Amino acid sequence: MGAFMTHCGWNSVLECVAAGLPMVSCPHFTEQFMNEKLVVDVLWVGVPVGVKGAAQWGVDAEGVLATRQDVERAVAAVMDYGEEGSARRARAAKLGRKAREAVVHGGSSFRNVALLIQHVQQRASTRNPWIEKKPSDCR
């Protein structure tokens, strides 16, 4: 697969990063526009379709949805094998390697999940006075 077209939901962005794929971004609403900024302007691994505003369900607002030409332009840009396209793919591949390294045994995400589990287990083993009280004692 050469690239992935995404609405820029957080899980899709993480999956693309982990797979080392460049993205064509087409956000619809909420945090997806912020995620698009991360993908396109910070990580430099995506090409925007050019959506200007949030979609309203049931309303086909002119200028909000991407046109065929917008999608075609973005796909052509992300699949370009010139200098910019090659650099984008190299950055995506590098991020993918870093993401995979983070989740292997001993990686940063592996360690952080282990620490979270340890913290939850420690908190669960300590006695919480609020849990021991009856509802009538809490007034």
List each language-model region with its residue ranges.
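Catalytic core of nucleotide-sugar-dependent glycosyltransferases
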Residues: M1-R139
